[in-house]
């Protein structure tokens, strides 16, 4: 009997098992995308005071050996209470590894100090070697901190090389020498760009979009404002006829205005650098923003100084929480990348030695 199905096989159609039907609805879009999300800080001064005072006491009892544990507890508290899109930050550094690095760093410091008592030449060589190691120290410290920092399940990663660090360091020296320090803001910009342009969260890359003139404005406007105030005070006194009546009083008034200006100029610079940096930083296609007010920031820093002095340092935790909360909660992120797609990069473990050498020799590598 003739079977027509064998003679004319059934043609596969798009709805057959060989050609599954295309989904009628597109993949679900992450509802977080396209919105501006604000950072939040959940810490409190009372909680941090408990951590801070215990850290101080244990460092005294252990002659400073508890310092790595104190550092990790402090960073974990601040990181762990910082939140963005319902994800918390975390610091995963291991205290005993930091302790080993600190002991080696202290050993280097002791050797240089002892040698300096017997040979000026050896001391100079030691200082020069340490100075030449600064780019390596900075780069290694940033890598260590990034490797041990997390956002949700995504680790941070720093890809800057030693070659790039030394090239930036050399350019900074040349610029500083040939401009007699007048272009110091350019050095700040180069350092910020080196740090941020090589920083990743998972596989999402940070980028600093600001140019060096933005940092010149950020740092020199407070300076011009300071000298403008001094000039205005001088003109007002001249118009009031005080210049010739009481020159001694005039000198003291200028000294007071000068000291007040110096008291305000650095916090104002710090505020403007903070604003310039974060309003011009992106991570992949997502963009950071800050509504930080430069005068509010300056007020917080100055009053923190006053409160810490009047309280003999006991209000240090309150001051630290106050400033950090303002910085964090002024930040927001216009999210254009799916945070669920963050994939960690393969990283090697990094030594804490460089960070501890930086701490011992007071080399500031903060962002």
For the regions a language model picked out, list residue spans one by one.
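Hydrophobic, aromatic-rich membrane-embedded alpha-helical segments
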Residues: 53-73, 131, 170-190, 302-322
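Membrane-interface alpha-helices
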Residues: 70-86, 187-205, 319-339
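Membrane-water interface of transmembrane alpha-helices
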Residues: 65-78, 133-147, 183-199, 267-278
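Intrinsically disordered cytosolic tails
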Residues: 260-367
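Membrane-helix interface segments in multi-pass membrane proteins
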Residues: 71, 109-130, 229-266, 270, ...
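Low-complexity, intrinsically disordered extramembrane tails and loops of integral membrane proteins
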Residues: 1-40, 333-367
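Interfacial aromatic "cap" segments that immediately flank transmembrane helices
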Residues: 38-58, 90-111, 153-177, 203-231, ...
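Membrane-interface amphipathic/juxtamembrane segments adjacent to transmembrane helices
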Residues: 36, 71-95, 142-154, 340
């Amino acid at each position: 009997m003739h079977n027509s199905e064998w003679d004319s096989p059934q043609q596969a159609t798009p709805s057959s098992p060989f050609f599954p039907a295309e989904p009628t609805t597109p993949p679900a879009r992450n509802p977080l995308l396209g919105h501006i999300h604000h950072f939040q800080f959940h810490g409190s001064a009372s909680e941090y005071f408990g951590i801070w005072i215990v850290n101080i006491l244990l460092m005294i009892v252990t002659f400073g050996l508890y310092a790595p544990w104190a550092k990790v507890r402090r960073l974990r508290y601040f990181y762990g209470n910082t939140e963005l899109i319902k994800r918390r930050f975390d610091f995963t550094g291991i205290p005993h590894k930091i302790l080993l690095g600190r002991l080696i760093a202290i050993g280097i410091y002791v050797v240089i100090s002892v040698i300096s008592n017997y040979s000026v030449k050896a001391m100079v060589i030691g200082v020069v070697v340490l100075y030449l190691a600064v780019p390596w120290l900075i780069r290694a410290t940033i890598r260590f901190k990034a490797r041990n920092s997390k956002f949700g399940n995504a680790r941070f990663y720093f890809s800057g090389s030693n070659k790039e660090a030394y090239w930036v360091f050399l350019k900074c020296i040349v610029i500083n020498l040939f401009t007699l320090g007048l272009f110091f803001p350019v050095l700040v910009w180069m350092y910020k760009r080196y740090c941020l342009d090589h920083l990743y969260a998972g596989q999402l890359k940070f980028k600093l979009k600001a140019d060096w003139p933005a940092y010149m404005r950020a740092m020199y406007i407070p300076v011009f404002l300071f000298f403008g105030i001094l000039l205005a005070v001088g003109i007002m006194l001249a118009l009031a006829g005080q210049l010739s009546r009481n020159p001694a009083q005039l000198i003291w008034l200028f000294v007071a205005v000068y000291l007040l200006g110096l008291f305000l100029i650095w916090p104002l610079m710090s505020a403007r650098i903070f604003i310039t940096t974060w309003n011009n930083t992106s991570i992949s296609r997502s963009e950071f923003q800050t509504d930080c007010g430069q005068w509010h920031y300056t007020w917080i820093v100055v009053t923190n100084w006053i409160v810490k002095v009047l309280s003999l340092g006991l209000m240090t935790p309150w001051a630290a929480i106050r400033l950090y909360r303002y910085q964090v909660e002024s930040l927001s992120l216009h999210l254009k990348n799916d945070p669920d797609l963050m994939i960690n990069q393969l990283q090697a473990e990094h030594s804490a030695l460089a960070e501890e050498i930086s701490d011992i020799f007071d080399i500031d590598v903060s962002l």
